[in-house]
Amino acid sequence: MELDVLMSESELTLRPMTRAEWDEWMPRQLAGYARHIADSGAMPEAEAWAKATADTARSWHAGYATPGQLVFRIMAGDEAAGWLWLAVPGPDPDRLMGWVYNIEVDPAFRGRGYGRAAMILAEGEARSHGMTSLGLNVHGQNTVARSLYDSLGYDVTALQMKKPL
């Protein structure tokens, strides 16, 4: 299996971000989210920034300590190789789906199976919080991520399309 050759999840860990790391990460996360929205053609850049800002404020209503919002550094030994944002709702039995809001493997670590291994670790983290499924959104133009999620067994549950006139 390719994962065994490139990277096994046992060689990679997810470490909770420190407050200082979160403070550094949050502006980059917000900018990246706004850029993805605008790049998808869903809306102009100014509207994308407004949406990203509102969505982020809603998700992180209590800042770093917001319950159910988990952000990890993807660690390859002692080296930070990226980050992963996982949301797990409270113990409500009607809300047992965790959500991967974002994952990013740093450029120097790409192409080595780190994203795959981190997603497998995220599945375990979600299970440890009582989740029975894990969802995510992927922008249509992100073909590398779409291929990864397909190979991990994620099913398409919605598809949004647009045609410029």
What are these regions (language model features)?
Residues E2, L6, P16-D106, E125, ...:
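Acetyl-CoA-dependent GNAT
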Residues R110, L134-A145, K162-L165:
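Conserved beta-strand-loop-alpha-helix junction that forms the acyl-donor binding cleft
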Residues R110, R127, D150:
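Short polybasic/polar patches that bind polyanions
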Residues G113:
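Glycine-rich phosphate-binding loop
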Residues R116, I120, G140-A158:
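Conserved active-site alpha-helix within GNAT-family acetyltransferase domains
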Residues M119, A126-N137, Q160:
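Conserved GNAT acetyl-CoA-binding A-motif
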